[in-house]
Design a protein with these regions (language model features):
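Short alpha-helical donor nucleotide-sugar binding micro-motif in glycosyltransferases
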Residues: 94, 213-214, 221-226
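Conserved acidic donor-binding segment of nucleotide-sugar-dependent glycosyltransferases
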Residues: 266-276, 284-289
Length: 312
């Protein structure tokens, strides 16, 4: 399966297309068609060549900066060793843009620090609010699919098999909390990630499941049907899965890192500094010692709807 399609980047591209459709903006996916502006999301040689060709033809180039040196680290085998080279490469791509768009003020600050001179705009990847509106049977459908009882305590997370996604902490939480079911959605080819991640994914625990990639509608059911969604990531440019979870009115705990400063801890969601705080908050949410913030979370992303972020 194409890694881009099942990643946040693939989701971001779909959001861009949907936002243009909602606003009646024509677009094409064929570079041979007639167009005024080229919007590039990827970092391969073909993308870089397309930007160069478009500029030569007098077209305007928007380069979407989804990647940073910081979120490349702690991902694939050798990513830390070559992160400096990766930074040079992405900068050479982003310099092709007349403007650069990136999802958050946090990622904008990182990219500005790379010495790029083009205007940089922070625009959220957005969320399709209607698609993630909870439905009455979502919880039941999720629990039936995964063989879960109604009173099972269920914690989920979503992401590629990367260390920076907090996967090692997630597995340790499952070890520490045997009376809770932990399910991780998303996947990455195991040959591409370090040994410690492969070992973690192969961990055999009765309360730990690596469910792999599931379709967006099934994932929405999981957001609705779990007791707590956690995002233990250590580095992000935004995190579309977080927007999805908030829109689906999940009980959300994120790691307390700068990219999530736009969320108010204790109001929109809960924020944990480390594994121990995640574990404490999971228990306190389930036991009712911490109030549910489901409705507040949904409100927090209402201004990030696709129609809203794509307004002129």
């Amino acid at each position: 399966m194409n890694l881009i399609k099942i990643s946040g980047l693939g989701r971001a591209i779909m959001h861009q297309q949907r936002a243009m459709e909602l606003n009646g903006i024509e677009y094409t996916l064929d570079p041979k068609d007639s167009y005024d502006v080229v919007h590039i999301n990827t970092l391969g040689l073909k993308s870089k060549h397309l930007a160069k060709k478009a500029k030569k033809a007098g077209k305007r180039v928007v380069y979407h900066a989804h990647s940073t040196q910081e979120d490349f680290r702690n991902s694939f085998i050798g990513s830390n060793l070559i992160s400096g080279l990766f930074k040079k490469w992405i900068c050479s791509c982003y310099r092709r843009g007349d403007v650069i768009v990136t999802p958050t003020e946090y990622s904008k600050s990182l990219i500005r620090g790379y010495g790029l001179t083009a205007p940089i705009y922070a625009v959220s990847n957005g969320i399709d609010l209607a698609r993630y509106e909870p439905k009455e049977n979502d919880r039941e459908a999720f629990r039936k699919k995964f063989g879960l009882k109604d009173d099972d305590k269920v914690v989920i997370s979503v992401g590629l098999y990367f260390e920076r996604k907090g996967l090692l902490d997630f597995v340790q939480m499952a070890k520490d909390m045997p009376d809770y079911k932990f399910i991780w959605f998303g996947k990455t080819p195991l040959y591409s990630v370090p040994h410690k991640i492969r070992k973690a994914v192969k961990t055999k625990l009765p309360n730990l499941t690596f469910a792999g990639y599931v379709q967006p509608d099934e994932l929405k059911q999981a957001y609705v049907g779990c007791d707590v969604y956690i995002f233990p990531t250590l580095e992000e440019t935004e995190g579309i899965v977080l927007l999805e979870a908030l829109a689906a009115k999940a009980n959300v705990i994120v790691r307390d890192i700068p990219v999530f400063d736009w969320l108010n801890g204790g109001t929109d969601c809960y924020k944990a500094k480390d594994k121990d705080e995640f574990e404490r908050m999971i228990k306190e949410i389930y036991e009712g010692k911490l109030p549910s913030l489901r409705e507040n979370g949904r409100k927090a992303v209402e201004n990030l709807s696709l129609i809203h972020i794509s307004e002129p």
